[in-house]
Amino acid sequence: MTDSEYLAKNYLTADPSPPTDRPKKKRKKTKAAEVESQGLIIADDDPPDLRSTATLSSKENDEYGPVVTGARSAEFRKTKKSNWKTIGSSTNTGTDTATATGPNAGRDEADAILADAMAEEDARRAAGDEDPMVVDQDDNEDDGGLRMESGARAGLQTAEQTAAMVAAQQKKRKAEEAQYKGKQGHAQETIYRDASGRIINVAMKRAEARRLEEEKLIKEAEAKEALMGDVQRAERESRRAALEEAKVMPLARTADDEELNEELKAQTRWNDPAAQFLTKSTGGGRSKTGKPLYKGAFQPNRYGIRPGHRWDGVDRSNGFEKEWFAARNKKERMQALEYEWQMDE
């Protein structure tokens, strides 16, 4: 007797099949069916060296060996009744059965559930859990829901909630109106924001722009100062000193002004024909910067700067000063000729 036949005989029950008049067809038995009735053998396909010690068949752990599963019989598949038995006290089982199988058992159970629900509802109402909650929000706070023009939120609301929202909206409007009335409205400043939404401090930005503009002007002045020579700086300082002295001078200066006469006599002109008749040296042989000057002849320049005492007399310039004087003299000569031709005509 096989294991499946033993289990079917002692532990499985099945209802007898109803008698039918149709003759049953005989199925041909195959070798595969015989193997299925005998059972299936489940074994690992892994090589022996990869198997764990728990899967190896030995005397200590025979339970991990190949498992033989019995095939399900036809009687077990046809059964409609559960053979499980409930183990427990007979008193509780009998009471529960009597309660559940009474004629009004369903109605009593529904009434009990409704009574419990009503009791819980009364308890919540007594505790005030479902009362309308009125929350005082700030002017800047908003719940994000849709609101009507009156201030009430869209959707189903209780009368208390609607009244509270309308009152809050009116309070907010009054506060905004009071803010823009009187001096407060004139004292408000425009708030500027950048692309990310951060507030821009306009006063700080303006101060920064002014500082950058001042630095730019200072750099331009320093660049111009670097292009100037020592003589030009000295002349600028002398003009500044003259302007300071002019503040206390009289408005009219006559030919008898000694200071003006001395200043004009001290000037050196390269084309002065009467300079050779002077018996007193006015230049002193030194420049305005205090350095000694060259005493020989030199090519004139447009700034009137004399060469230093160490000059060897060789003109190493690119000839611009000579061409500048030649162009200027040519222009003056042409103007004089045009005037003479006009007078002759």
Swiss-Prot record:
GO process annotations (BP): mRNA splicing, via spliceosome
Biased composition (Acidic residues): 129-143
Record keyword Nucleus present: yes
SS bonds (residue pairs): none
Entry's Gene Ontology cellular component terms: cytoplasm; U2-type spliceosomal complex
Intracellular or extracellular location(s): Cytoplasm; Nucleus
Biased composition (Low complexity): 91-105
Record region (Disordered): 1-106, 120-148, 265-314
Primary role: Involved in pre-mRNA splicing.
Protein name per the record: Pre-mRNA-splicing factor cwc26
